[in-house]
Regions:
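DPxDG-like acidic metal-binding loop motif
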Residues: 21-77, 81
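Well-ordered beta-strand scaffold positions
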Residues: 13, 78, 85-86
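An extended, acidic
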Residues: 87-202
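N-terminal subdomain of lithium-sensitive/metallo-dependent phosphomonoesterases centered on the IMPase/IPPase/PAP
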Residues: 1-33, 196-200
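Short coil/turn connectors at secondary-structure junctions
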Residues: 4, 22-25, 42, 55-59, ...
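General beta-strand structural signal in soluble alpha/beta enzymes
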Residues: 7-12, 30, 39, 117-119, ...
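Residue-level signal for inorganic ion chemistry
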Residues: 1, 36, 65, 74, ...
Length: 202
């Protein structure tokens, strides 16, 4: 990537570029192993996530399950795919009917139809992009999620017609290695609004 003139942003190395310099135009945000605890335990919910950010805009994204080979991809303006087939987010509107992936323990007042804590943020979010996956995701933790954990996945969700926001209203698109966010995603705006309300009250 450096030889091609791309900078790289990852949790382990920070933001680096060719010959140690940061390339300002194209940055690849990468998480080589999302869900490392799951991987160590042999659980089939871990992934590699990549997102190309050009001039501050996410343009190409991929989240690949390292155990099953399932691959979610998206190109800006070109929609989203799973294993090469077009996908769209579902139409779930109500939290009480939804199955939600959560990060950290939810409060007792959080009452979707069901929730799961799967341990791999990128895969949790990417699954929202396709009917049959989670209806939404929410992070109840205190700002521990880095951009490498979610940027590729929210790009895929948005291209599939889903929606994403930060629980505290901040921009999710950042190339600051020290920035942390609380991403919330959903198949529909109505469900996102309910999830954001739940996040604010936690």
């Amino acid at each position: 990537l450096y030889e091609a003139g791309f900078a790289v942003l990852s949790e382990e190395s920070g933001r680096t570029g060719p010959d140690g310099e940061v390339a300002p135009t194209h940055v690849v945000v990468v998480d080589p192993l999302d869900g490392s605890t799951n991987a160590a335990l042999g659980l089939p919910w871990c992934a590699t996530a990549l997102c190309l950010v050009s001039n501050g805009v996410p343009t190409v994204a991929m989240v690949a399950n390292l155990r099953t080979g399932t691959r979610y991809t998206a190109v800006l303006g070109g929609g989203a795919q799973r294993n090469g087939h077009p996908i769209i987010a579902g139409s779930m509107e109500r939290l009480e009917d939804a199955i939600i992936a959560v990060n950290a323990r939810p409060p007792a007042t959080f009452r979707p139809a069901q929730y799961r804590s799967m341990g791999a943020t990128a895969l949790d979010i990417a699954s929202v992009a396709a009917v049959g996956g989670f209806h939404g995701t929410i992070d109840f933790d205190e700002d521990r999620i880095g951009v490498w954990d979610y940027l590729a996945a929210i790009t895929i969700v948005r291209e599939a017609g889903g929606v994403a926001a930060d629980a505290l209203g901040r921009d999710l698109i950042t190339l600051d290695h020290n920035a942390r966010r609380r991403p919330v995603t959903a198949a529909s705006q109505g469900l996102l609004d309910e999830l954001l309300a739940a996040g604010r009250s936690s």
